[in-house]
A protein has these predicted regions:
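Generic low-polarity alpha-helical segments
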Residues: 1-2, 93, 125
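Substrate-binding rim/cap in mid-to-C-terminal beta-strand-loop elements of soluble/periplasmic
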Residues: 1-36, 40-52
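C-terminal, low-complexity/hydrophilic appendages and adjacent surface loops
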Residues: 10, 14, 60-107, 116, ...
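Long, internal low-complexity/basic segments
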Residues: 17, 21, 26, 105-144
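Intrinsically disordered, low-complexity regulatory regions of eukaryotic regulatory proteins
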Residues: 36, 54, 96-99
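Short beta-strand or tight-loop elements
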Residues: 38, 55, 72-74
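WW-domain-binding short linear motifs
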Residues: 53-60
């Protein structure tokens, strides 16, 4: 982002969502964010502050066939494009050591616990966002 009172030539790798932009703009112009709005302001990040971590991870959703979670070290993607086993894929990447995501670790037995732990985090996000009440979410989770 660029504009008055926003630090220039500054990069920050904090995890933010698109829905965080509106609360950020509200804070920058000095108005309260309506209570009905999801998201949180990342104005301090725009000011160049590097204090506490903004978010520990991102919950990833694409349409009704992809769910995932990404943190500083790993990304787990669950892809469901149908009801048959051949339509279901799991991808685990060590993004610290493999930033281009070229080696899928999901089938490596030594990463089984990591896959299960990250799946549990996906389920927590699903419940937090009440995804099964939404048609796309319901469609994905019936195939999970």
């Amino acid at each position: 982002m660029a504009g008055p009172e926003i630090a220039e030539n500054h990069r920050n790798d904090a995890y933010v969502y698109l829905y965080d932009i509106f609360p950020t703009l509200c804070e920058k112009v000095g108005i309260d964010t309506p209570s009905s709005v999801d998201g949180k302001s990342f104005a301090k990040l725009l000011d160049g502050e590097h204090g506490e971590k903004f978010r520990d991870e991102l919950y990833l959703i694409f349409d009704n066939f992809v769910r995932g979670v990404k943190d500083d070290n790993y990304k787990l993607i669950e892809y469901r494009n149908g009801d048959k086993e051949e339509d279901k894929w799991t991808f685990l990447y060590d993004i610290k050591n493999d930033p281009w995501e070229t080696v899928n670790l999901a089938t490596d037995e030594s990463y089984k616990d990591k896959v299960n732990e990250m799946r549990e985090r996906i389920l927590n996000h699903r419940d937090e966002w009440e995804e099964q009440a939404h048609p796309w979410g319901k469609d994905f989770w019936t195939r999970f």
